[in-house]
Amino acid sequence: MELGTVKAVITGGASGLGRATAARLIAAGARVALLDRPASAGEDVAKSFGPSAAFTPADVTSAEAVTAALDAAVAHCGGLNVLVNCAGIGTAMKTLGKSGPAKLEEFTRVIQVNLIGTFNCIRLAAPHMAKSAPGAHGERGVIINTASVAAFDGQIGQAAYSASKGGIVGLTLPVARDLAELGIRVCTIAPGLFDTPLLAGLPEPARVSLGKQVPFPPRLGRPAEYGALAAQIVENAMLNGETIRLDGAIRMQPR
């Protein structure tokens, strides 16, 4: 798919990986809707991108809110042929800690936002994509999900986060097969240590130390590098049903 023909919805688009992906696509001529929490900076971010971008507020776990946001996105973009799922949350909790067993509601919340929220957006975006005019080889859409290296190398305290991201990896191939007959591709990116809002609260020395754990390049990943890979997935029609690690060859240790 040519980037100039992209009509995209990006969840979590107000910051981090989502915002960087929006910037990459808009620079190539795409029209983009940023789907993020109503309390996010989405409105200001969309305005900063100019008329090619719009903010469509929604909670990714709500069918009603996502349906309304997608309808607004389709109206703004003139259709929908790309979905990039970047919305997500993280929490640290040991299965059994000093205060007792992990709180089930915390585990459930992470699964609800990261895994169920991703699938909710996929299932509701697919009907819009199916209405798109087919391009080369009948392609109608591309869906890109965001997992994490925690899906493979979960650390102590990451049971909920790793489970949610592992679920995204697990659904990638079957959803790609489900949607293949409609001409819709599905891939997942599993980032390593990236300079995103999830790490923003750390002191600079701690961020530098984390970056040095990466074999090469020995630094935190840049959101623009995620955006570049997302753009390459959109352009390369043979990328389908695959999870790509974007991690500088890091393999996380237990802690």
For the regions a language model picked out, list residue spans one by one.
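Short, small/polar-rich loop/turn modules that mediate ligand/substrate recognition or access, typified
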Residues: A180, R185, L239-E242
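Active-site helix of classical SDR
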Residues: I122, S164, T172
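Alpha-helical segment proximal to the catalytic Tyr-Lys
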Residues: P127, A176-D178
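Canonical Rossmann dinucleotide-binding motif of NAD(H)/NADP(H)-dependent dehydrogenases/reductases
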Residues: L3-A33
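Catalytic Tyr-X3-Lys loop
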Residues: I89, G100-N120, I144, I168
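C-terminal substrate-recognition "lid" of short-chain dehydrogenase/reductases
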Residues: R222-L246, R251
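Conserved mid-core segment of classical short-chain dehydrogenase/reductases
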Residues: G90-T108, P127, K131-H137, G157-A160, ...
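Residue(s) in the substrate-gating loop at a strand-loop-helix junction
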Residues: S148
